[in-house]
């Protein structure tokens, strides 16, 4: 239903309706994804204190399919960022570009690794994800109204980093979506490394 509605709105060129649709639905998906991510993190931490055998049946499939899951997650993020900027005209700020660099890079790394079935890439993915997460958390910090610790890399023709383009539920912004995406790639990498037997 989401894909069909998205496709019809793109064909009919109702850009404002499409923007409202994407903002509300992606914000809800991000919120649900964040809740799942929190439970996943708590569960992986709990694995350190419990026997691995009882949880292995849940995490082995995630580990086995971590490359395609990561590829499609970063591909979706890439497509949505390009739809927002190139089709809907929502200009990215300087910090958004840094986050895009990390996500776009991971999409290609996941894609090539999946094609070659190379499971040794998770150290690289983890490094890119942590760096991207730091940028996204700082960007979210700015957009929640706190003062700059480091100047925004905005130039005259781009958007200012501390002005949210949209905000749903009082805290879901583009940087928060990136936080959740980087969180998932971190958890995928950790799960793949823990259960890569």
Which functions belong to the PLM regions below?
Residues 97:
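Cys/His-coordinated zinc-binding microdomains
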Residues 2-94, 103-106, 110, 114-197:
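Secretory/periplasmic and organellar redox-cofactor proteins
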């Amino acid at each position: 239903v989401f894909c069909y509605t998205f496709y019809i709105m793109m064909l009919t060129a109702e850009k404002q309706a499409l923007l409202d649709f994407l903002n509300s639905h992606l914000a809800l998906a991000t919120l649900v994804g964040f809740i799942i991510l929190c439970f996943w993190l708590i569960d992986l931490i709990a694995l350190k204190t419990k026997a691995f055998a009882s949880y292995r049946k849940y995490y082995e499939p995630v580990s086995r399919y971590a490359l395609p899951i990561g590829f499609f997650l970063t591909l979706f993020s890439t497509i949505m960022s390009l739809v927002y900027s190139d089709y809907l005209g929502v200009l990215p700020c300087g910090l958004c570009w840094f986050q895009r660099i990390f996500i776009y890079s991971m999409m290609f790394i996941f894609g090539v690794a999946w094609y070659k079935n190379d499971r040794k890439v998770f150290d690289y993915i983890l490094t890119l994800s942590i760096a991207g997460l730091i940028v996204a958390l700082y960007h979210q910090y700015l957009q929640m109204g706190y003062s700059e610790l480091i100047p925004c890399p905005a130039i005259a023709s781009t958007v200012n980093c501390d002005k949210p383009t949209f905000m749903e539920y009082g805290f879901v912004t583009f940087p928060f979506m990136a936080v959740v995406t980087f969180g998932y790639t971190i958890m995928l990498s950790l799960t793949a490394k823990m259960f890569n037997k």
